[in-house]
Amino acid sequence: MISLKGISKTFKTKNGAVQAVDNVNLEIEAGQIFGIIGYSGAGKSTLIRLLNLLEKPTEGSVKIDGKALSSLTPSKLRAARQEIGMIFQHFNLLWSRTVRQNISFPLEVAGVPAAQRKKRVEELIELVGLHGRGDSYPSQLSGGQKQRVGIARALANNPKVLLCDEATSALDPKTTDSILDLLLDINEKLNLTIVLITHEMHVIQKICHQVAVMENGKIVEQGPVIDVFRKPKEQMTKEFVKQLAQTGEEEQSLWHLLDEKSDGTIVSLTFVGNPAEEQLVTELIRRFPIDISILQGNISKLQQGSYGKLYLRLLGATNEIEAALAYIRGKEIDVEVIEHDR
């Protein structure tokens, strides 16, 4: 559905050239939710604007549904853009228009007849969960409701692709989850290809099938979300995964426990796919003459399975502990022995 080949974007400034996007290659399949994550200044926003040629690439080609956008005439590019919806961090609504009028706007621009527009607008109001708010103005809506209007407007012309530029960054956690649930529902109902950029690993974890990690204008790591969680290669990716696996408070709590329980072997177990922590601990107790304490654990649900982290303290003879660790590794569970002489 989406193909980027050797995409680069350089901006000229009074202080010299700035390479915002550097030789990016991506293939995004139809119906996928593809997440691009990175810190501020990584080049994410520039990259997503290159997908519909709001920014023109300095080098490389962008293909959407087989069409090379850079080679299209202005009129054909406008037609191609109608198949690419976009939502933004700060909603970009028309404040003097009602919900219905905001959603109707792209249909008016496209020359859709009034009766057809009215029918489509009502369908979209129901789809995004805004029943009863059609005559409200943006100033009368919550942040989440404003973003729902933005989503409905982006879907007005039945696009094949939806681009999301930090669409949940201005929302509180509960509202963020409701918008992510809506995007997931739309993806499943319409088989819509969604490309989103974010700096929040929670967004990737909750709805994405594939992820690309961006740093200094480059894609430094990419793949199925579950694989990137299982074996993050780059240091920045490891930092993002750690954010989800363990909050700052949880990390402090863990180190406090380690200070209290300084004896024994402390191990971190990473489960990916279908975690079965309780079953594993029961098996270890049954098979090996060692004492086991669970220090901390959590599970995050991914689109292709689950990701879990479990911290154990093992007490017993060295050879028995080594045998237990070998048994765990034999289950294809990642094991890390944690040094805790702090």
Curated annotation (Swiss-Prot):
<keyword id="KW-0813">Transport</keyword>
<comment type="subunit">
    <text>The complex is composed of two ATP-binding proteins (MetN), two transmembrane proteins (MetI) and a solute-binding protein (MetQ).</text>
</comment>
<keyword id="KW-1003">Cell membrane</keyword>
<dbReference type="InterPro" id="IPR050086">
    <property type="entry name" value="MetN_ABC_transporter-like"/>
</dbReference>
<dbReference type="InterPro" id="IPR027417">
    <property type="entry name" value="P-loop_NTPase"/>
</dbReference>
<dbReference type="GO" id="GO:0033232">
    <property type="term" value="F:ABC-type D-methionine transporter activity"/>
</dbReference>
<protein>
    <recommendedName>
        <fullName>Methionine import ATP-binding protein MetN 3</fullName>
        <ecNumber>7.4.2.11</ecNumber>
    </recommendedName>
</protein>
<dbReference type="InterPro" id="IPR017871">
    <property type="entry name" value="ABC_transporter-like_CS"/>
</dbReference>
<dbReference type="Pfam" id="PF09383">
    <property type="entry name" value="NIL"/>
</dbReference>
<dbReference type="GO" id="GO:0005524">
    <property type="term" value="F:ATP binding"/>
</dbReference>
<dbReference type="InterPro" id="IPR041701">
    <property type="entry name" value="MetN_ABC"/>
</dbReference>
<dbReference type="InterPro" id="IPR018449">
    <property type="entry name" value="NIL_domain"/>
</dbReference>
<keyword id="KW-0067">ATP-binding</keyword>
<dbReference type="GO" id="GO:0005886">
    <property type="term" value="C:plasma membrane"/>
</dbReference>
<keyword id="KW-0547">Nucleotide-binding</keyword>
<comment type="similarity">
    <text>Belongs to the ABC transporter superfamily. Methionine importer (TC 3.A.1.24) family.</text>
</comment>
<dbReference type="InterPro" id="IPR045865">
    <property type="entry name" value="ACT-like_dom_sf"/>
</dbReference>
<keyword id="KW-1278">Translocase</keyword>
<dbReference type="InterPro" id="IPR003439">
    <property type="entry name" value="ABC_transporter-like_ATP-bd"/>
</dbReference>
<feature type="binding site">
    <location>
        <begin position="38"/>
        <end position="45"/>
    </location>
    <ligand>
        <name>ATP</name>
    </ligand>
</feature>
<feature type="domain" description="ABC transporter">
    <location>
        <begin position="2"/>
        <end position="241"/>
    </location>
</feature>
<dbReference type="GO" id="GO:0016887">
    <property type="term" value="F:ATP hydrolysis activity"/>
</dbReference>
<dbReference type="InterPro" id="IPR003593">
    <property type="entry name" value="AAA+_ATPase"/>
</dbReference>
<comment type="function">
    <text>Part of the ABC transporter complex MetNIQ involved in methionine import. Responsible for energy coupling to the transport system.</text>
</comment>
<keyword id="KW-0029">Amino-acid transport</keyword>
<keyword id="KW-0472">Membrane</keyword>
<dbReference type="Pfam" id="PF00005">
    <property type="entry name" value="ABC_tran"/>
</dbReference>
